[in-house]
Amino acid sequence: MNFRGNRMINNDPLFDLLNKEQQRQQHSLELIASENFASPAVLAAQGSVLTNKYAEGYYQHRYYGGCKFIDEVEMLAITRAQQLFGARYVNVQPHSGSQANQAVYLALLKPGDKILGMSLQCGGHLTHGSPVNQSGKWFNAFHYGVDAHSGLIDMDEVETIAKRERPRLIIAGGSAYPRHYDFARFRRIADAVGAMLLVDMAHFAGLVAGGCFPSPLAYADVITATTHKTLRGPRGGMILTNDARLAKKIDSAIFPGLQGGPLMHVIAAKAVALGEALQPEFKRYAGQVIENAQAMCQQLAQRGLTLLTGGTDCHLGIIDLRPQGLTGAQVEYFLELAGITVNKNTLLGDPQPPSITSGIRIGSAACATRGMKADDFTLIADWISEIIFAIKTPNIADICADIRQKVTKLTTNYPLPYQ
């Protein structure tokens, strides 16, 4: 990234910070499951002249003039999403996955309605009815969890709670669950109690697009997704459905219900990312993401670490650190010293607060974008294991420094996609 040739930019410390962040990304292993690297084309679209344009409303129904090309940009993003996921109706205006979920709630629910989602401790998301989130404050939220032994979603519990509480909306999907979802059974349960089914595929949308993860489209009334994470696009959200009636309600919930002007530069970047995901090489990428995650989880288990559910079907894994007597905050800190970025994550029955936790979440999407393969992830798993088992020893600093050098050497072989 070169910022030369502009006097104001050269004198602005902001751009020095951007360069430093680029160096951090280049020479670190990004294992945060919700992060990825956007292509130069995505970055260019997001930094384009569309930043300058207001466009409240929808295709051919804008509240501002000068939207001829804006309409075409948004329609391009919509048609690409329709083609990619097979959905009849797509709204690409949500600023984030959280606002996509909020729009669904606004469209389908009334304050005080019952909703049923996955517990945050078991891998759910804040927007699925957490008491600290708007979804938990405005609605009467109930939560299902995972089996304490297998770590898998307890579908019998889902059914029991649904039959007892008869929620208006059931939510499938989460932010820290490493296995497939039984969308068919979620659908049967929803039908049995007269509920609608929302699938939040923010994390695995790219894997669905690549044909490597089951699609919820045949089962869900409505689907929300993010366009970054495994889709490798800009930070943003979208909503998909095959129901024309719901689509109309959702459009009204986004605008004018929640948002004003859409971020057209971001929608353009979404169109780029969706176009990239339609290419044959994206299927290969999605498959590599899963292969890498499975190789990493398998090696971590062989080294004696405890993986939630014993492994993964997707791009992420969850390590339970309680057997080592460590916290997620500790492990996150020491891994970052070695140039490996992860995030602490709460677990079922976690005695630690969310700022500390007893687990960490790891993901393969970002490093797969750089071209890393299963052998690289096996090596990365060895480094993670070595650090975890050394944290309580006096030579942890030396071990982190040694692995930091190895990380730098490995990342040098895999340039960032925007370089």
Curated annotation (Swiss-Prot):
Family annotation (PANTHER family): SERINE HYDROXYMETHYLTRANSFERASE (PTHR11680), SERINE HYDROXYMETHYLTRANSFERASE 1 (PTHR11680:SF35)
Annotated compartments: Cytoplasm
SUPFAM superfamilies: PLP-dependent transferases (SSF53383)
Protein name: Serine hydroxymethyltransferase 2
Gene Ontology CC: cytosol
Chain positions of site Plays an important role in substrate specificity: 228
Job description of the protein: Catalyzes the reversible interconversion of serine and glycine with tetrahydrofolate (THF) serving as the one-carbon carrier. This reaction serves as the major source of one-carbon groups required for the biosynthesis of purines, thymidylate, methionine, and other important biomolecules. Also exhibits THF-independent aldolase activity toward beta-hydroxyamino acids, producing glycine and aldehydes, via a retro-aldol mechanism.
Catalytic activity: (6R)-5,10-methylene-5,6,7,8-tetrahydrofolate + glycine + H2O = (6S)-5,6,7,8-tetrahydrofolate + L-serine
Pfam families listed in its UniProt record: SHMT
Subunit structure and binding partners: Homodimer.
Stored CDD domains: SHMT (cd00378)
Sequence similarity: Belongs to the SHMT family.
Domain of life assignment: Bacteria
Enzyme class: transferase
UniProt-recorded Gene Ontology molecular function terms: glycine hydroxymethyltransferase activity; pyridoxal phosphate binding
Positions of modified residues (N6-(pyridoxal phosphate)lysine): 229
KW Transmembrane helix (keyword) present: no
Gene label: glyA2
EC number(s) from the headed UniProt entry: 2.1.2.1
Binding-site residues for (6S)-5,6,7,8-tetrahydrofolate, renumbered to this chain: 120, 124-126
Species assigned in the record: Salmonella typhi
Annotated HAMAP family: SHMT
UniProt main location, coarse: cytoplasm
Any GO BP annotation: glycine biosynthetic process from serine
Cofactor: pyridoxal 5'-phosphate
Pathway given in the UniProt record: One-carbon metabolism; tetrahydrofolate interconversion; Amino-acid biosynthesis; glycine biosynthesis; glycine from L-serine: step 1/1
Key words of the record: Amino-acid biosynthesis, Cytoplasm, One-carbon metabolism, Pyridoxal phosphate, Transferase
